[in-house]
Amino acid sequence: MNKKTILLGMPFDNEIFRLIETNLKYHGFDVVSIVDATSQFRYPSLSARLKTKFQQLILNDRLAKSRLKAKLTKQKIIDLMDHIGEVDYALFIRADIYPHSVLEYIRKHVKFDMVNYQWDGMHRYPDIQSRISLFDRFYIFDPADISSNTLPNTNFYFDYDLCNLPNPINDFYFVGSHLPDRDISIANFSKFAQEKGWKLDFHIFCGSNPGFYRKFYPNNINLF
C-alpha cells in the first residue's frame, strides 16, 4: 500500500523540524520538506545583489531584500510542487514565514487537509492573520487567541523512540528565548518550584550577553 504524503513547512529554528520529520515517517508518512526553502538566503547572482543594494541605499526601499527572498522562495517551492505533483496533506508550523502566494499555490496541490499550528502568540507574528482562511484547520497555542476560526492545541511530544528511556532526573524542562512579556512569569514559577523542591531544567537564550539578563532570572535557570 502506498504511503500517504505530507508536506512539512516550518522554521529552521533549533532544527526541531528534523524530529518532527522523523516522527511523521515513524507514523507511516512520506515527508516532503520545504523547510530549507526559507532557512538561508543567498543572492542568486551579483547583479541581483547590486540591484537590491541600489534599491535599499539609493531608493530607500527597505523591503527590497524581503521581496527578493519571497520571490526566490516561491519559485523554489513551485519547482518542487511541479515535480512531485499532489500531496495528501500539508502541515505547517508558523505559516507566516511563507509568502501568501506560496501558501495559495500549495493549497491547490493538497488532496486532503492543510493544517497550521501557530506555536507563538498571534500578536507576535501578526502577518499570520491574513493566512488563516487558507487552512482547513488552524491550531493555536495561546488560549487568548481562540476564536471561531482557530482551534486550541498545547505542547506535543515525539513517540518514535520511547524504548529504554532513562528515568528523568528533573521534574520540568523548558527551553526558549528571553521575551520581556514572559520573563516575570518564568522567574516566578522557578521560585515556586524551588520552594516545592521541584527540579528544573530550564534554559533561556539571551543572545550575545547572557550575563546582562541574569537579574531577571533565579540561579536555577540556565542562561545561554
Residue ranges with predicted function:
Residues 94, 106-121, 138-139:
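Active-site proximal beta-strand in glycosyltransferases
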Residues 14, 92-105, 182:
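An aromatic- and histidine-rich active-site surface loop
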Residues 103-111, 190-194:
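Surface-exposed amphipathic alpha-helices with a cationic face
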Residues 65-72, 100-102, 110:
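Internal alpha/beta domain cores that form substrate/cofactor-binding pockets in large enzymes
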Residues 2-52, 69-75, 84, 119, ...:
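Nucleotide-sugar donor-binding catalytic core of glycosyltransferases
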Residues 51-65:
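Short, structured active-site "lid" loops
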